[in-house]
């Protein structure tokens, strides 16, 4: 259903698109999907690894199976999909791989141990793909989004019953030099840049689009 909606949105703009459904943690399924795409459309020139999940549970209460599931989708899947597209990129001596990392690639926070472990690993996978395949003119970079104003985060930004701000909303705005949540469209420019020839000399880099959170220690108390 989500794929159909996406295809319809592209069609409404006059853009021809192809949609495929695949379990990105299933290596044979991914290999088959990549082969199908190559046959129907052509080999993949730009890969964006953006599938991901999060489990918010204190580490001492987290099931090992849940930890593995987060690692499987957030770290193993980007490895599996990148592995599948790399041979064609190597043959063409050109390719772009963009991994969606996170501020948790750099920071820790309560209840997200599995997510932070996966995103930290994805940062290093990004750098290693750069190191291993840069000689083939393949660029692998990452985008580390900050806190984005999406329908999923809307409950965290809504006013409380007494008219006060949600505590997490206040927390994020205080931690962000910009003093606000980021708009999804603000990720567009970085993604286009990393997918274009303008970034041919940029490799192994994580571009943090976070409103300055990682650079900011917070305001000094008065």
Residue ranges and their predicted role:
Residues 87, 131-135, 200:
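Alpha-helical segment proximal to the catalytic Tyr-Lys
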Residues 58-59, 66-71, 168, 172:
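Substrate-binding pocket helix/loop in short-chain dehydrogenase/reductase
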Residues 102:
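Residue(s) in the substrate-gating loop at a strand-loop-helix junction
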Residues 79, 94, 180-209, 214:
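C-terminal substrate-recognition "lid" of short-chain dehydrogenase/reductases
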Residues 82, 118, 126:
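Active-site helix of classical SDR
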Residues 48, 134, 139, 202-204:
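Short, small/polar-rich loop/turn modules that mediate ligand/substrate recognition or access, typified
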Residues 59-61, 107-113, 135-136, 179, ...:
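Active-site loop immediately N-terminal to the catalytic Tyr-X3-Lys motif
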């Amino acid at each position: 259903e989500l794929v159909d909606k996406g295809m319809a949105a592209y069609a409404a703009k006059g853009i021809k698109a192809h949609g495929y459904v695949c379990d990105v943690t299933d290596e044979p399924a991914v290999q088959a999907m990549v082969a199908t795409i190559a046959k129907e459309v052509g080999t993949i020139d730009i890969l964006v690894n953006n599938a991901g999940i999060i489990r918010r549970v204190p580490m001492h209460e987290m099931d090992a199976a849940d930890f593995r599931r987060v690692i499987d989708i957030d770290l193993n899947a980007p490895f599996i999909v990148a592995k599948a597209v790399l041979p064609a990129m190597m043959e063409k001596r050109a390719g772009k791989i963009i991994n969606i990392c996170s501020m948790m690639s750099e920071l820790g926070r309560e209840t997200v141990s599995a997510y932070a472990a996966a995103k930290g690993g994805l940062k290093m996978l990004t750098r290693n793909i750069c190191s291993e395949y840069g000689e083939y003119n393949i660029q692998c970079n990452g985008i580390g989004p900050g806190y984005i104003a999406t329908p999923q985060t809307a409950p965290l930004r809504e006013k409380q019953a007494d008219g006060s701000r949600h505590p997490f909303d206040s927390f994020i705005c205080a931690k962000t030099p910009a003093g606000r949540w980021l708009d999804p469209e603000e990720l567009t420019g970085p993604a286009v840049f990393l997918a274009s020839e303008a970034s041919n000399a940029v490799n192994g880099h994580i571009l943090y689009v976070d409103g300055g959170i990682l650079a900011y220690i917070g305001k000094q108390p008065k």
